[in-house]
Amino acid sequence: MKILKVTLICALVIALTIPGFAEIQQRSGKVLEMKGKVDVAQIGGETVPAKVGMALHEGDILETKGDAWALIELEGIEKSTVEIDENSQLLLSKLEMDTEEGSQDTMLDVAIGKILIKVAKLRHEKSKFEVKTPTSVVGVRGTEFAVEVEALE
């Protein structure tokens, strides 16, 4: 009888906790276009040259050198594009979506350089799209805007 109670309690705890974790999924992005030398520092630590069609993931850092640029698409419930200008560095800090709820959470971190972002209108009230720089954070719900970060002295 005691084993049955322990088993039922464990099953109840598992049933109550798993659905909360199962709803959140990692989104991805991909390189749509590029010119010049664009590198991707992947979450595992390896830096590889970017290629058109290459998948991008949360934690990846894109860096453009010289006169290089890249256009990436962030996939999800609402798709957005980010154009990364020359001599820029962009971290894909957070790319999450809750498929059950229909919301998504995006955080981009611009260390240096300029990016042009086209954010699709966020339909769900809990959806977030934020861009962080060394001195500020901006959140939008659907617009087109540019962010430029110059070297701090």
Predicted regions and their residues:
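N-terminal secretory signal peptides that target proteins for export/translocation
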Residues: 1-2
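Sequence-pattern detector for short linear motifs
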Residues: 5-8, 144
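Flexible, surface-exposed loop/linker segments and immediately adjacent secondary-structure boundaries
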Residues: 22-153
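Bacterial N-terminal signal peptides
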Residues: 7-17
